[in-house]
Structures are given as C-alpha cells and as structure tokens.
Amino acid sequence: MSEISRQEFQRRRQALVEQMQPGSAALIFAAPEVTRSADSEYPYRQNSDFWYFTGFNEPEAVLVLIKSDDTHNHSVLFNRVRDLTAEIWFGRRLGQDAAPEKLGVDRALAFSEINQQLYQLLNGLDVVYHAQGEYAYADVIVNSALEKLRKGSRQNLTAPATMIDWRPVVHEMRLFKSPEEIAVLRRAGEITAMAHTRAMEKCRPGMFEYHLEGEIHHEFNRHGARYPSYNTIVGSGENGCILHYTENECEMRDGDLVLIDAGCEYKGYAGDITRTFPVNGKFTQAQREIYDIVLESLETSLRLYRPGTSILEVTGEVVRIMVSGLVKLGILKGDVDELIAQNAHRPFFMHGLSHWLGLDVHDVGVYGQDRSRILEPGMVLTVEPGLYIAPDAEVPEQYRGIGIRIEDDIVITETGNENLTASVVKKPEEIEALMVAARKQ
C-alpha cells in the first residue's frame, strides 16, 4: 500500500530541526474542528503542515520540536487524553501512552495541560518558530506561554526574544517530494484517473451533472479515497466556461460537452485531473477544433517540462499554440506575434498553465516572479491548458459556449517528467471509442 512511513515523518522533523537556530523551538498546531451547522461538524481535515510532520489526524494537538544545540533535540506532542465516554460518542483517540511508538515522537503530553507545560518547554530558549495568525486558538496559547515567561523573571524564567514564521522553510521542504510521497501521489492519480474513466463510461444525455459527480465519488471511495481533494466540477454546455463551477445541477443535453475537474485525496495527497468530452459520445466539428488546440497545448507542455525549464517558459509556448489555432479558426484576427504581445488570448485562456500539487491541491512553494522558477527533480505540478469561449463572445457562432480544459499531473524527474495521470484517455478518438464501447455493454 502506498503510504508515508513513520521513518519518513521522523526524517522530515529532523530536516526542519537542522534548519532551526540552536536554542529554539518550533510549534506546529493541528487544525481545529469546523462547525457545519448547529452541533454538526464538517468531516475533520488535518492542517497540511501538521500532517506533513506527524501523519496524525486528530484536532487539539501541537507538535513541539526543541533544538537545544546542534547535537541535542527532541520532540513533544500535545494531544487529547483517552476518554471512554467521548470515544463512545465520537471515536477513538490515540492518547499519550501510544503516541511515541505510533508517531515516533520522544514523548506525549495532554493537550488539556498545555497552558501549564508549554511555557516550561520554552523557558530559556532564544527563538520560537510559530505561524502567527494561522489559528486564533494557537496564537492565544503561544502568547499566554510567552507572557508567563516574561512575567516570571523572579522565578528565573526567560522568554524567547525572537519569533520567526516557520512557513517559508516548511513550504520549501514540501515543494520537493520524496519517493514515498511520489508513490502516494501516483496512487492518487491512478484512482482519480479511474474515476474520470467511469464518468465517461456512464455519461448519457438526460442525466444531470450531479449524477456524474456521484459516479466519480463512488469510484474514489471504492479505492480507499474517502474524500475529493477539492469541490468536484461537472460543467456541461456553457457551464464549462465557468472555471470553478460547482453547482453541478443542470441536465446534460445531447450535443453538449461536459467538463469534469475532479481529484481524490489519498493518504492526505491530492489528485487533480480535468477531462472534457461529449455528452453523447461524439464531438461536433467545432468542439473538435477547439479540443485539438487544447490537446496540442497539453502534449507540447508534457514534452517540454523537464529540469531547467520553468512554468513561464512553457506557458509561452502554449500561448503561441493557442493564438495560432484561434487565428486559424477566425476567433482571433491579426498577426500572431502582435496578438501575443497584446495578450489577446486572455479572454479565452485566463488562468495559469500549472500549479504545484501535493498535500494541498494548490500546493505550497514559491513560484518566482511570473512563475519563472526553474524546475527541479521532485517537484510535482499540474498541466492544464484550457480554452473558454463565452456564450456572448464576438466569434463565429459555432464556437460560442464551448469550454474545454485538459489536465494531467506530472512529477519532474532527472531526465524529463512522469505523467501520473496518463491512464485516463484524452485523445478525441480514444474518448469516443471508450464511450461507444460502454454503451454496448
């Protein structure tokens, strides 16, 4: 099974400690529970940074990494105590006794005692690393501990003089995926690909968009991915021109396209695939003409992405393909170079070509100005060109209301890239063949 080992979490914690100053502590807080309505909560989703260092999926938890000097450090987890009554109602808790063995931390303390314990752990240190402003409850806990230290000089207490945000360091770490992470992302891609394939096979005119949403989520669940990594987009007809359309409530009509942007979350990591296909299984000529431009853009990107390139550089090649294609169809008019200089493509391709992918679907990490950061092995990103012709656009009528995006997930390797989501078809003739075959079953 693809998952992150205890040893991997320990390596990550050690890697952060090595970047900390001597005489310091890093505090990483779990996400709080979020109320849905009245006394009902949303399904709990752990803070991605906390998960990155622990793999622990309970609220009311804090990881403390203490670096005394360059050779001495230790880890402390504050977490909820075992409580028979609470566990009958709401599920099992790990508790303090099992945490060191399960999670690989040095010791565990009760979260209910954090106000009595945290200031003692911080006493005498010079620096505290804390993501101030992320969670109000976390700021209250940290500020309370520091205030106790500042007021305790007569008891030989001293507070850290410096607070540093650990997020820039941690998010740079998260940008480069380990082999274990890539294996999990590969599985997330496989499950997501199977769900998109299922949607193509099940699609029929007269169904509603939410029917395909249900088929997709069913396939996620069948393979151990309980939740989507973001709100599923199923946009048929003109809805495909709305980038983050999530109502998913319209009837899918014969002759329309349907754009599906959906990904599963597997072991905390996100899949993210988009496919666009005809509701009736057969592209019209106008749909195919737009689709071919987007597909060429994707295939060119997949050839170009490798170490030493950048999102900015590859985007430039994609824009040229798009503008040239739109000129040939009469959607744009003029010289290709002049149109590119004028950003004439922006009304039809208004989002970025790629974003980082990992524990978050829009994962953390610096892109550089205009996404000019040079790509390196271990980076994982999406490739998602799209063209969206608004229903009221002043273009030839047959193209109005067509929205097409095609998206794959890749990891940059030493020699190029690996497509993590190649197993779901995207060539028009392959899509049509798949949908025709499904209708015969």
From Swiss-Prot:
Name of the protein this chain belongs to: Xaa-Pro aminopeptidase
GO molecular function term, any single one: manganese ion binding
Binding site for Mn(2+) 2: D261, D272, E407
Family from the record: Belongs to the peptidase M24B family.
EC number: 3.4.11.9
PROSITE patterns given in the database record: PROLINE_PEPTIDASE
Subunit text: Homotetramer.
CDD domains tied to this protein: Prolidase
Subcellular location: Cytoplasm
